[in-house]
Each structure stands twice: as structure tokens, then as C-alpha cells.
């Protein structure tokens, strides 16, 4: 039995009602430290992680998404060429839940250089990728079996550049977020200090307005509240989280609040990365790279504004991504520069994080994706 087969077998033996399958996206540098997407299991009683195993070889699968059926995983390829064509790619994989192994299904070229993020609409009909260096977003229809069809639309993002150089040197779309009602797509552009809104017509992106952020903010990622009334945007460059009210009819955004993710008086270098809402809707979490920390906020039950609870060390260097378990009891953070995952216990009443000391080595870890146990 070769090493990969042995590790798959070991991963399968750890599967129980008290374990949770997690996939980790990575950068795959030329030195071969990482080879693609890794699978690991979280013991939901102790917080311990199993030894990571390579689930599928892939070129810089730096962001992952899950089909609503829990059986198909989508990954972007943050590369300059795919299948002999310039630009990144979008791939789909069949999940083998017992072992964590991923079987490649298809791969489509995006035509955009350096893809940074992908989003799947709630109805599982369309996949949209943001090309950070290509300055565009591209949409792909999804077939009934979850496979990705060829691209059907590409929208360039244009407008005046933000004031923060050199980062705001051109358009830099950084994320794709669908409204919970499946009506709109929101794209954060770090280079333009704007949030672009689109509608979908048979998977074709149709421009539907833009919304300005604070100059130099550098909007990166966003998350909706479950009811769709609030959109939370983490701004990479000025290390803040902005709260927007979202009109239920028009989808228009109105700025309500901006809060810092850093301690008062901190003067070191840092920039934000990921933002998540707790499954119970009461807390918001954001990561700081440089300060290497996780900021925890309470959501006001009526107006959705945020108040800082705590800022805790991320357990490594450059926390580019993290995710909460579906039951909200655990948070797993991917620290890219220290090549590790760190597990935190989440208090569902206060939102506070407790470092468990449980960690696992994953080279260039940059994305964390939980697969619900009932998938």
C-alpha cells in the first residue's frame, strides 16, 4: 500500500459521528511544498485534527466552494494559464466522503489572470469567478450534475482608481457574493474602492449598479446576514469592516458603520483577509495579516451594527482564511506563512475564541472549507 492509499485509509478510519471533513486550498509553488487540495478531519469532541492527506492534485487551488448537495467541490486555479489558454481556471471535483478523496470532473478556462475568488449562487445554477489581475468577473453555467459549462459572460470592472498606491494601481475584483434571495451578485473591487452589483440572466452577468466605499479602503471579501438585510465587507487596505443595509427590493446598499479590526494605537503593518458570520448570526469574525490575529465582533440584534469583543492571535503567520464549523462550535484558521492550521473553540453565547492548541501542518494553506456531516 503506497503512502497516499495508507493516508486515505487512515482518514476513513477517523470518520465518525464525531468528526467533520474539511478541505484546505493552497498555493502550489515551484518547490513542490504543496501539491493541491488537502483533506483533514476535525474531531468535534476534542478539536484535534487528523493528519492532512492530499485529496487532489491541482495548480494553486486558492479558493474553494461547495455545491449545496455537499457532493461536489469547486476550486479556482490561481495561475496564468490553464489548458494552454491564458488565465486561471475553474474546476469541479466529486467528493468521496468516506475517504476525503476528490475525483476531478472538469476544468474550464476563465480567460482572466490570477483568479482570486469564486462564488456559487444559492440555486446552484451559476459559478462566478473574480480575476484579481485581469480586472474582470466571469460566469459559468452549472449543469444539473454540477459540472461546469463553458464561460457565457465576462464583465470588465472599470472606474477611477483608489488613492492607495501601489495596491490600487488598476481594477482588482477580489470576491463574489450572492444575495441570499438569489437575485443579485456583489463583487468587491480592491483597486477601485467599489462594490459592483450584477443580476443573472440565464447565467449571464448583467450590470446593475455600483456602490462606493471609503477612499483607500480596498474592499476584499463580503458576507450577508442570513436574512439578507445586512452586508458586511472587510476592507483589506485600511483594516476595517463596513456594515451596509441592503434594500430588500432594489438591492441597493447604504453604509451604516465602519469599525477597525486592529487594537487601538496599533501602528504596525497589517491588512485584512477573510470575514465570516457565526451560524447563529450573532457574531462576525475577521482576520488580520501582519498583526496575525482574529477580531471578534458582536452583531446588534436589531440594526446589525458591530461592537468589538476581542482580538486574539491567529496561532500562526498570515491568517489568509478561516471558517466556522456548521454547528458554530469550532473555528479553523489557515495561516499561510507558518504553513499550519489552528483550531479554536467558539463560545456560542459570547462569540469568544479559545485556542485549543490543536494544529496541523499544511503548506501554503489559504482556504478552509467544511463539508457538513449530513452531506
Where are these regions (language model features)?
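Short, solvent-exposed loop/turn segments at conserved positions within beta-propeller repeat blades
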Residues: 30-35, 82-88, 132-135, 169, ...
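A short beta-strand motif characteristic of beta-propeller blades
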Residues: 50-56, 103-108, 161-166, 206-212, ...
